[in-house]
């Protein structure tokens, strides 16, 4: 089986599903460790090039794996292109509201809300780093195979021009959307720890997206760490069965201990 099969496998059941807004796509799934809390929290943002046909289900596998390591997970759904209000800025507004909902989760489930890591895969990596530019209280962010340069994603026509559908046009048509949404254009506070993991064998989002981001942001004085996994593809990073997963998991645990 390839790691892309993770998109189709039914995930382990969540402990709870809670709405953070009134739209049917404004909810998240909570998975808790079996031990006693308080637990650190990973808020996960799934990928799918911001399109409605890809939902949070496949990310349930990695969230379940992290809960076995003593970490509570908040697997977030958000409006996507094809949903009413999805795209920019609606998708990002949902992510921001889901992040701001975490203190309520903390009261209900005995979470350590001082230890929150926001993690995103592919398009979710863009949303995670964009969130870090707008929420200075967020001090841990991890992008897995992230779409971290939206102008370059447009130039390469990644996934049939997904970025044009997400932002509502090209860089010349909606330059303000690219400025607001592009992690490469934003500034993350220096106190925020950023980790990027990318597979050298990624044929969906090229690994140089993360490599270039790390180089440029380090040059601006941001706290950025980059790990490239030689044999990993795009989906290996979110598949707990893969050979790449232990490196993802150990990075999460390292960031939580920092």
Model regions and ranges:
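Glycine-rich nucleophile elbow surrounding the catalytic serine of serine-hydrolase chemistry
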Residues: 120-130
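C-terminal catalytic histidine-bearing segment of alpha/beta-hydrolase fold enzymes
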Residues: 31, 204, 211-258
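Short, surface-exposed "cap/lid" segments of acyl-processing enzymes
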Residues: 34-38, 42-65
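Short beta-strand/loop motif that positions the catalytic acidic residue
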Residues: 190, 196-198, 202
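Catalytic nucleophile-loop/oxyanion-hole region of alpha/beta-hydrolase
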Residues: 54-63, 74-115
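Short beta-strand immediately N-terminal to the catalytic nucleophile in serine-hydrolase-like folds
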Residues: 118-120, 144, 197
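N-terminal cap/lid segment of alpha/beta-hydrolase-fold proteins
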Residues: 1-36
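Hydrolase active-site cap/lid region
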Residues: 130-174
């Amino acid at each position: 089986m390839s790691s892309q099969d993770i998109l189709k496998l039914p995930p382990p059941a969540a402990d709870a599903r809670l709405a953070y807004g009134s739209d049917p796509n404004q909810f998240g799934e909570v998975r808790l460790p079996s031990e006693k809390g308080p637990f650190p929290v990973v808020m996960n943002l799934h990928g799918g090039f911001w399109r409605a046909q890809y939902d949070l289900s496949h990310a349930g596998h990695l969230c379940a794996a992290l809960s076995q390591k003593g970490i509570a997970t908040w697997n977030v759904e958000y409006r996507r292109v094809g949903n009413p209000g999805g795209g920019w800025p609606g998708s990002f507004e949902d992510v921001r509201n889901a992040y701001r909902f975490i203190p309520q989760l903390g009261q209900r489930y005995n979470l350590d809300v001082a230890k929150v890591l926001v993690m995103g895969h592919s398009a979710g990596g863009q949303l995670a780093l964009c969130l870090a530019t707008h929420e200075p209280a967020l001090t841990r962010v991890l992008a897995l195979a992230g779409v971290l340069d939206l102008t370059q994603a447009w130039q390469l026509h990644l996934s049939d021009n997904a970025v044009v559908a997400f932002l509502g046009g090209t860089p010349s048509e909606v330059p303000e959307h690219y400025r607001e949404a592009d992690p490469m254009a934003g500034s993350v506070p220096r106190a925020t720890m950023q980790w990027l993991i990318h597979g050298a064998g990624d044929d969906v989002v090229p690994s140089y997206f993360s490599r270039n981001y790390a180089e440029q942001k380090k040059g601006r004085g941001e706290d950025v760490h980059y790990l490239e996994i030689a044999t990993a593809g795009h989906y290996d990073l979110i598949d707990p069965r893969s050979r790449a997963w232990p490196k993802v998991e150990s990075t999460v645990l390292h960031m939580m201990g920092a």
